[in-house]
């Protein structure tokens, strides 16, 4: 059973001593709703995680989530704050990130996307893990094809995080810089909530299989 270990930010832990560790987060951009929806539902399904040790942050930007806006109350993008750590939400979040996770998935939505894709931090070399998770997600929806001509494209559906993100440190980059196999998975906002949730669950379940 998941236990709540913090109210601000919301954080839940499924503790299994000695097991491999999975980190999941969503809602750092308040107008991206399928990630929080998916993780809140998964909190009711501890059996989904096959005896892993799991940490879940379902809604990292509570103000943005309540007001359906990307930024926090101070109009700051929390996913560009991990280098400076100026925002209280980021400071409180980092205090709870005290484990060496085996895999970390940061759940996001792409507003203009037409399929799934993954952002790869520079420090993360585990393309095999990303490819496996992306493949599982594509059973629910196609790979986004907007990035074919972008220099940041590593391979179809996997993009290198750009220098701006590396400079300011997104959540995934912060984790990757500390030795975690972390990356951002994105689903398109234009699909129904049901399909977005199924796609995110498929990616998470593949991460569970990799670690089990």
Predicted regions and their residues:
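Structured catalytic-domain cores with a bias toward divalent-metal coordination
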Residues: 1-212
């Amino acid at each position: 059973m998941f236990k709540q270990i913090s109210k601000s930010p919301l954080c839940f832990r499924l503790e299994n001593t000695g097991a491999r560790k999975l980190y999941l987060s969503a809602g750092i951009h308040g107008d991206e709703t399928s990630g929080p929806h998916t993780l809140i539902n998964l909190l009711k399904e501890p059996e989904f995680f096959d005896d892993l040790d799991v940490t879940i942050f379902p809604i990292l930007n509570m103000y943005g989530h309540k007001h359906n806006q990307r930024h926090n109350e101070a109009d700051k993008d929390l996913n560009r704050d991990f280098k400076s750590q100026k925002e209280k939400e980021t400071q409180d979040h980092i205090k709870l990130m005290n484990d060496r996770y085996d895999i970390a998935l940061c759940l996001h939505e792409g507003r203009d996307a037409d399929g799934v894709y993954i952002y790869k931090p520079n420090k993360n070399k585990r393309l095999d893990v990303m490819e496996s998770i992306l493949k599982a997600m594509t059973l629910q929806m196609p790979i986004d094809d907007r990035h074919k001509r972008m220099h940041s494209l590593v391979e179809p559906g996997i993009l290198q995080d750009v220098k701006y993100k590396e400079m300011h440190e997104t959540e995934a980059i912060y984790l990757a810089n500390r030795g975690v196999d972390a990356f951002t998975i994105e689903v398109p906002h234009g699909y129904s909530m049901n399909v977005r949730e199924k796609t995110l669950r498929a990616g998470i379940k593949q991460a569970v299989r990799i670690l089990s």
